[in-house]
Amino acid sequence: MQKKRFEQQGEKTMPMIRAEFLTGKTQEQKRELVEALTRETARVLGVREQSVWVVLQEVEPENWAVAGTPLSER
């Protein structure tokens, strides 16, 4: 079972989750996101929550484009 494999690695397994999103989220939303990502990553991978790292990256709409158009122009 894959979960046991991760458990056997112990502290050597330190998953890092990166979440990128547009600016404008509240501190509460970001806190809830970090908690949920941490909890679910630990559950699925079978590691301790203390070993999960989460990095949030807020991006300005002019720096994020879809189909060649910055979101600030949509």
Model feature map: region roles:
Residues 10-11, 23, 66:
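Low-complexity intrinsically disordered segments
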Residues 74:
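A charged helix-plus-loop insertion that forms the helical arch/lid used to bind
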Residues 16, 21-53:
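Amphipathic, hydrophobic secondary-structure cores in small proteins
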Residues 43-71:
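C-terminal structural segments of small proteins and small subunits
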Residues 1-13:
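Short, Lys/Arg-enriched N-terminal segments with co-localized hydrophobic residues
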Residues 2, 31-33, 71:
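Residues in and immediately flanking transmembrane alpha helices
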